[in-house]
Swiss-Prot record:
The keyword Nucleotide-binding applies. One of its GO terms (molecular function) is ATP hydrolysis activity. One of its GO terms (biological process) is DNA replication. Involved in regulation of DNA replication. Binds specifically to the oriC region. ATP binds at residues 72-76, 220, 232. Keywords: ATP-binding, DNA replication, DNA-binding, Nucleotide-binding. The keyword Cell division does not apply. It comes from Pyrococcus abyssi (strain GE5 / Orsay). This is ORC1-type DNA replication protein. SUPFAM superfamilies: P-loop containing nucleoside triphosphate hydrolases (SSF52540), Winged helix' DNA-binding domain (SSF46785). It comes from the Archaea. Pfam families: AAA_22 (PF13401), Cdc6_C (PF09079), Cdc6_lid (PF22703). Belongs to the CDC6/cdc18 family.
Amino acid sequence: MSEGEQLHLDKLFERLLKARKIFKNKEVLRHSYTPKDLPHRHEQIEALAQILVPVLKGETPSNIFVYGKTGTGKTVTVKFVTEELKKVSQKYNIPVEVIYINCEIVDTHYRVLANIVNHFKDETGIEVPLVGWPTDEVYAKLKQVIDMKERFVIIVLDEIDKLVKKSGDEVLYSLTRINTELKRAKVSVIGISNDLKFKEYLDPRVLSSLSEEEVVFPPYDANQLKDILTQRAEEAFYPGVLEEGVIPLCAALAAREHGDARKALDLLRVAGEIAEREGASKVTEKHVWRAQEKIEQDMMEEVIKTLPLQSKVLLYAIVLLDENGDLPANTGEVYSVYRELCEYLDLEPLTQRRISDLINELDMLGIINAKVVSKGRYGRTKEIRLNVTPYKIRNVFRYDYAIQPLLTVSLKGGQRRLL
């Protein structure tokens, strides 16, 4: 490296720092940020506050079930209200503990109980390992640490449907009945879900206990999303860096996806990041469209990355057919290549009927298009095409050790046999 090149690199960060600043505080646009005011959620704030106010009178509040689609403000509103409750409770010398658990990550009965116990470890000196103890022993410790003094403990289970679908409702049964086993403390549960249907998985006794009170969050419309983005933008960006059409466009695009405020915030943040990296003086509508494309690509890559192994092998069979010029293909043609790939990996193949189900799942995820077409007297068949480029799929699979061995495989030209 020459001296001039080294000097250029040394000055790199200084040069980037001196570029036109777009963001004043980017964190304001993150999902984890709790603003001082929540536009268009005052009705839900009031409802939650009415249910929780008994705490300030020394009474046990009802359990609450909160539901609504993704990006409707459920989590941020619950955090906002419980933080306000904690502030006011301190004024009245009423001990309140709020324990927030994301059940997409903490998704087993054992881990939920362990997280609650470990919330109090600084106070109690008791810590439960994330694996290894009998569950009933962890539950006994939970009761012990909670009941060490008089207090109200509010347990927020976010994405509660993920927990129930994976591990059943036993933990909910325990937590919604724990007050009968406590002498000093009182526990209330707030369950948050994107999926109302998950209640079908619950034992009727658990459902009646959890759903003592319900608060519904409807989707935002485009105008409401504009208000939310305008409020956040004032804190997030320097004055004058957003072109006039940027916020309305972000709001309109997010409103198309069931009024998802998270999507709207992501669009605005990523558009700002793209403008900043380009050294642009303003964030424009073009930056928003590019942000939309990037977010969709990132989401699709994440979907492909988290597919089960059999679905990945099936998808790679479709990739090979595409690269061989054999798409659209029917289910039988795809299945033939899929079986060969399974043999190559020493993997037990699924039945053609099950593969037909997986093709439908890939279609629903938007990774492929599986259109049923009529062949006249030959009946109906599926025509399968890719919606994602083979390059992008291969790029995701490059980092997947289970599927990596297939990346050197191709089909013989004009034949559907592996090379």
